[in-house]
């Protein structure tokens, strides 16, 4: 919207979450009084209006730039929103500063490789030692090399893998999914390990399509991607309902099915693309451990045992703030599944329902006693698949 000179964005994304002005409107605390985001209706539908924020300066990075400022990104693992930022700042009369690894003669970069045209760039900084990642470069992330199936290390058999395996059962052949950061990021690796990675397509908000998502500090990259999209285009696809399933992680879950990932225990973690991804997906799979803080489990022989319980409740009566709205999900007809290492829950009109129990887990001692609210126990409570 900034590049196009539009006043803002009208979207269903964020309804009934912390960015909705009927809640906190995205305000961090009571110091901020003005409502930046507006709630409105159009043709009988609810929307939030996000005003355009004019940008004065941006710092972007490329790999190669020619002497006219035309830049390519062949060594970058994603294109993210580099072009969109440059356009927005330029059209606002601002300053676009581009860093690149090398400079070449004007016109020597193939036009199909150019991601940022020179007329958008005001200042070029050459850094011959710039690194692609924290620890250098990885040609598997850029797609220059293809990793063999057995070259990708499998996850150890622990609580994270238990969650990833169960979550994987929520995606079907031909589906398009998103994988978020956190405990959910192991799903792509498990899919490759199980030999089903080619049956569906996993995407990451930063742009990769297909392949196996990287984990930890390298999240946002993928190995063996089939395509690499600009991040704004990826989010257009998400916001428009293109995802069949979203795999995301949760920090807090409350009795109404709301999830908080952005602000808890006095810490501001931020949302990333969480709100967008949740808002448009047909199915939302939220992954996490039942408790946090020193939780230790033992996995083996088809069972899981709690060796040391976590110090902190994650299933609480009411979320401090709402990043994902259970109410809105039910309004939109989304299927919502919450997967932990010891149980699976689903969101219904009646509330959060316990539907599956892991082998080796006691429902009273290991589930209900460890939650801040009592879930509805399904009359068809079944065992989690081993």
Positions of predicted regions on the chain:
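Conserved phosphate- and dinucleotide-binding cores of soluble alpha/beta proteins
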Residues: 1-148, 216-386
């Amino acid at each position: 919207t900034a590049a196009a000179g539009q006043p803002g964005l009208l979207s269903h994304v964020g309804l009934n979450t912390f960015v909705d002005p009927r809640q906190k409107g995205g305000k961090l605390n009571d110091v901020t009084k003005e409502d930046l985001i507006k709630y409105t209706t159009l043709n009988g539908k609810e929307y939030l209006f996000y005003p355009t924020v004019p940008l004065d300066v941006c710092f972007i990075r490329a790999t190669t730039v020619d002497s006219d400022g035309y830049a390519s990104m062949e060594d970058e693992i994603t294109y993210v929103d580099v072009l969109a930022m440059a356009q927005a700042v330029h059209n606002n009369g601002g300053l676009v500063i581009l860093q690149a690894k090398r400079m070449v003669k004007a016109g020597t970069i193939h036009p199909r490789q150019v991601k940022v045209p020179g007329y958008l760039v005001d200042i070029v900084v050459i850094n011959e030692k710039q690194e692609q990642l924290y620890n250098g470069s990885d040609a598997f992330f850029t797609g220059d090399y293809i990793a063999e199936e057995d070259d990708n290390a499998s996850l150890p058999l622990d609580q994270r893998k238990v969650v990833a395996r169960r979550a994987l059962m929520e995606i079907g052949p031909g589906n398009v999914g998103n994988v978020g950061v956190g405990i959910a990021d192991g799903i792509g690796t498990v899919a490759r390990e199980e030999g089903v990675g080619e049956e569906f397509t996993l995407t990451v908000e930063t742009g990769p399509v297909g392949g196996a998502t990287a984990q930890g500090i390298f999240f946002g990259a993928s190995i063996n991607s089939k395509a690499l999209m600009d991040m704004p285009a990826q989010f257009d696809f998400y916001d428009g309902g293109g995802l069949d399933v979203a795999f995301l992680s949760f920090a807090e879950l409350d009795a109404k099915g709301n999830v908080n990932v952005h602000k808890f225990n006095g810490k501001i973690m931020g949302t990333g693309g969480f709100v967008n991804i949740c808002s448009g997906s047909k199915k939302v799979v939220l992954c996490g451990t039942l408790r946090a803080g020193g939780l230790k489990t033992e996995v083996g022989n088809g069972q899981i045992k709690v060796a040391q319980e976590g110090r902190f409740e994650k299933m609480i009566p009411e979320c401090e703030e709402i990043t994902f709205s259970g109410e809105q999900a039910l309004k939109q007809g989304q299927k919502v599944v919450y997967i932990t290492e010891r149980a699976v829950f689903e969101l219904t009109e009646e509330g959060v329902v316990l539907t599956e129990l892991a082998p080796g887990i006691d429902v009273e001692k290991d589930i209900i006693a460890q939650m801040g609210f009592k879930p509805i126990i399904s009359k068809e409570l079944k065992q989690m698949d081993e």
